[in-house]
Regions:
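ATP-dependent adenylation/nucleotidyltransferase module used to activate substrates
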Residues: 1-113
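ATP/NTP-dependent adenylation/nucleotidyl-transfer catalytic domains that generate, transfer
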Residues: 116-195
Length: 195
């Protein structure tokens, strides 16, 4: 975002952020999981809708979100519609204009139009998203751990602490390595309780 602000100084940028730091929300709600993915709402969708309401003064504002989701990224994303109304948030219309583009088309477009490139692509990632995600593959987890160890250490320590509460000590390491924490549901082992 900061590079974009420098590159386009005449544009007005509005930043939408959750009032919760990711590490605080992970401690409070537990690590996000495939069946319990609260993270996108807390850190992306809701802050965007709240910022839009603040800017427009209209509580019933709807957002049109242009995203970079592509079918090639995963079997799950391949099933997404190019335009979806209310699929992710009732106040949001998602438009995925590059949904059917492949990697070659993406990079040709970026290079031809001299578009800024996120450094994550230079580090070998084929998409940019959350560094620690319950929907990520083992490959993604390995790459982010290798490329961004300082950025993910806080979230990984929260996963470690959560797992220490729900598994016997001799099973914790294997449970984490195999992504068992990504399959949790409910809040049974959270400090503030749960089902």
């Amino acid at each position: 975002v900061e590079n974009a602000k420098l590159h386009w100084p005449d544009l007005r940028f509005y930043e939408a952020k959750s009032h919760l730091d990711p590490s605080d929300s992970w401690r409070e709600f537990g690590p996000p999981a495939a069946k319990n993915r609260w993270c996108c709402a807390v850190h992306k969708s809701v802050p965007t809708i709240l910022k839009l309401r603040e800017i427009t003064g209209n509580y019933n504002s709807k957002a049109v979100v242009f995203d970079g989701v592509r079918a090639e990224e995963s079997a799950r994303r391949a099933k997404y519609d190019e335009i979806s109304i209310g699929a992710k948030n009732i106040s949001q219309i998602n438009c995925s204009p590059i949904h059917k583009w492949n990697n070659a088309e993406i990079y040709c477009y970026i290079l031809k139009n001299r578009i800024m490139l996120n450094d994550a692509y230079r580090n070998g990632l084929f998409r940019v998203g959350c560094m620690v995600c319950p929907m990520s593959s083992d490959w993604w987890d390995s790459m982010t751990k290798f490329c961004y160890p300082d950025e993910i250490v806080k979230l990984h320590s929260i996963v470690d602490n959560y797992c220490a509460n729900c598994k016997p000590e001799n099973e914790v390491k294997k449970y984490i390595e195999q992504g068992g924490w990504k399959m949790r549901s409910g809040g049974r082992f959270l400090p503030n309780g749960g089902n």
